[in-house]
From Swiss-Prot:
The modification N-acetylmethionine is found at residue 1. InterPro entries: Cucumovirus_coat, Cucumovirus_coat_Asu_sf. This is Capsid protein. GO terms for molecular function: RNA binding; structural molecule activity. Capsid protein. Probably binds RNA and plays a role in packaging. Belongs to the cucumovirus capsid protein family. SUPFAM superfamilies: Positive stranded ssRNA viruses. Its main location: virion. The N-terminal arginine-rich stretch does not seem to be the major RNA-binding region that allows formation of an infectious ribonucleoprotein complex. Residues 1-30 are annotated as: Disordered. Keywords: Acetylation, Capsid protein, Ribonucleoprotein, RNA-binding, T=3 icosahedral capsid protein, Viral nucleoprotein, Virion. It is found in: Virion. The lineage of its organism: Viruses, Riboviria, Orthornavirae, Kitrinoviricota, Alsuviricetes. It comes from Cucumber mosaic virus (strain Kor).
């Protein structure tokens, strides 16, 4: 073999080695595959826990259904003694109740703790009789009644509790905007007294879209 053949053979061997090294799996490729598998399993777990019609559950951010919008009601509970109750009907603005036959699909409660919050509260939504004055004895009798879920929200030393929302699906009931006055948000200060500067409640009522005015208010 002459010198030129030896040099050519050496180059071919180096080229084959370089091609082989590029195709060999690296540790970063293996780590990426493991991470992808973990993310896939996490997505399956999260999707399995989404709320259904028959199982209200905690949610993060929900989009309104097509053709629907929402109206929010804000309530700041007064001082509630330990072991006592507070209730307020879901009274929507007149501009919304004017369209009382528009269907309501869902109700969502959002608990917004203020900086001084250091208590434990139980929050729920109940359908209440029109004659009810939402007194403490009346709420006490209604609170444990029925299958409606309850949000237990409590102070956490490491920060606010992550689960601060509860969603109710009313689609099967064919409830409408006019029915909302028959519902009330109820609060139970089970273990601690609740001060007036500890908590704000937001109730989001998802309903069919209503016409909006094109004229600015006077």
């Amino acid at each position: 073999m002459d010198k030129s053949e030896s040099t050519s053979a050496g180059r071919n061997r180096r080229r084959r080695l370089r091609r082989g090294s590029r195709s060999a799996p690296s540790s970063s490729d293996a780590n990426f595959r493991v991470l992808s598998q973990q993310l896939s399993r996490l997505n399956k777990t999260l999707s399995a826990g989404r709320p259904t019609i028959n199982h209200p559950t905690f949610v993060g951010t929900e989009r309104c259904k097509p053709g629907y919008t929402f109206t929010s009601i804000t309530s700041k509970p007064p001082k509630i003694d330990r072991g006592s109750y507070y209730g307020k009907r879901l009274l929507l603005p007149d501009s919304v109740t004017e369209y009382d036959k528009k269907l309501v699909s869902r109700i969502q409660i959002r608990v917004n703790p203020l900086p001084k919050f250091d208590s434990t509260v139980w929050v729920t939504v109940r359908k209440v009789p029109a004659s009810s004055d939402l007194s403490v004895p009346a709420i006490s009798a209604m609170f444990p009644d029925g299958p409606s879920p309850v949000l237990v929200y409590q102070y956490a030393a490491s920060g606010v509790q992550a689960n601060n929302k509860l969603l109710y699906d009313l689609s099967a009931m064919r409830a409408d905007i006019g029915d909302m006055r028959k519902y009330a948000v109820l609060v139970y200060a089970k273990d601690d007294a609740l001060a007036t500067d500890e908590l704000v409640l937001h109730v989001d009522v998802e309903h069919q879209r209503i016409p909006t005015s094109g004229v600015l208010p006077v």
